[in-house]
Structures are given as C-alpha cells and as structure tokens.
Design a protein with these regions (language model features):
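Charged interaction scaffolds used for protein-protein
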Residues: 1-203
Length: 203
C-alpha cells in the first residue's frame, strides 16, 4: 500500500488516531492495521503482524503530489473534474467559500470542497439532476489522499492567484478616482482588510 492507494476516509481515520491522547502507541498501531488492511490484528500471528507493519512504512513518507486528471472513476461512478474557476457559477463559488470558512483546507473538509468541482459524467449543472451527497461519499471513500491533497492545493492556489489579480485591478481602479489624501488612506486601509478577509477566510 502507498499514499496513492489510501482513501481520504481511511487517511482521516488514521489521523484521528494520532489526535487521540488516550491511545497508547500499541493500540494506535493495531487500529492502523485494522483500518488499512481490514483485518483483525488480534488474530494475526507475529510474523503476519511484522509483514503488515512493514507495509505501513509509507506512512512515514511525504504524501506525493500527483497530476490532476480530467476524469476520475470513484467506485461505480465516473466524475469529470471542472478545473477552470472562470466557469464557476455563483452557487459553486458561494459553496466553495462557505466550505472554506467552515473547515478551511483541512482533510476532513476535502469531500465538501471537492464536491463543488466533481460532476457526474454527462451532467453540466451544479447540484442539478444528481445527488451531491453521493458525490461527497464517493470522494471520501474512493479518492486517494494523494489525489485529494493535490486537487485541493490546485484550487486553493488558483483561487488565491485569481483573487489577487482581481483585487489588484480593483485597487488600481479605486485609486484612479479623485479622492483627498485622507480618503485614499482610508480606502487603502479598508482594502487591506478586504484582501485579508477574502484570501484567508476564517482567520
């Protein structure tokens, strides 16, 4: 097993083990084996246990970046990844912003964030004629953590760059307007607040 085979759901389950201060290292190890390999670790022989531990070594490695694809087969369903933010509807943009405010870029929030951009093959209208909860379930259960991280990073970076360009253009237009020195100072101050609130929601 490796990062490109580990589902988003299982990654979050393992992450939760490390956030639990009451678990001993031994218990954490056994739970990891159960999550990753769907076996009962208490029934394993010692040599089998060692084999599973060896297979978990990838957890100590960095999650690799993977190339984004146009389509993804998740379970029984095929999804098209809509990568161009310029074609987002207002509804998509608002959902994306709200999901960022609610959970940021944390892996627990990836299924929500990415459901904005994953369309069942053949569908063109966001949230219409398909079950968006099914999309989130498929992302959670079948998209690898390596893919989820790479796709999320792409959209978060794309969003920041797009917003910076828009805000810089807006600032330029505002400062072309005849204003007193004090008014310009106030506008610049408010504009800085807008940039921070827009680029870093929830901070």
């Amino acid at each position: 097993m490796n990062w490109t085979e580990l589902s988003l759901k299982k990654y979050n389950e393992i992450k939760d083990l490390y956030l639990d201060p009451d678990l001993s290292d031994e218990d954490r190890l056994l739970y990891q084996i159960r999550i990753l390999f769907d076996v009962d670790p208490l029934k394993l022989k010692t040599n089998e246990l060692r084999n599973y531990i060896d297979k978990m070594k990838f957890l100590g490695e960095k999650v690799p970046k993977v190339k984004l694809k146009s389509t993804y087969k998740l379970g029984e369903n095929v999804y098209v990844l809509k990568k161009d933010l310029r074609n987002l509807t207002v509804a998509q943009w608002l959902d994306f912003q709200n999901f960022l405010k609610d959970g940021g870029g944390d892996s627990d929030n990836y299924a929500n964030l990415l459901s904005v951009f994953f369309f069942p093959k053949g569908e063109t209208e966001y949230g219409e004629n398909y079950d968006i909860e099914q999309v989130r379930s498929d992302i959670n259960n079948y998209l690898s953590i390596a893919e989820a991280m790479s796709i999320s990073s792409f959209f978060l970076l794309y969003r920041k760059i797009s917003l910076r360009l828009f805000l810089l253009y807006t600032k330029k237009q505002i400062l072309k307007t005849p204003l007193t020195k004090e008014q310009k100072k106030k506008v610049k101050k408010e504009f800085r607040k807008l940039i921070i609130a827009t680029l870093f929601p929830g901070d």
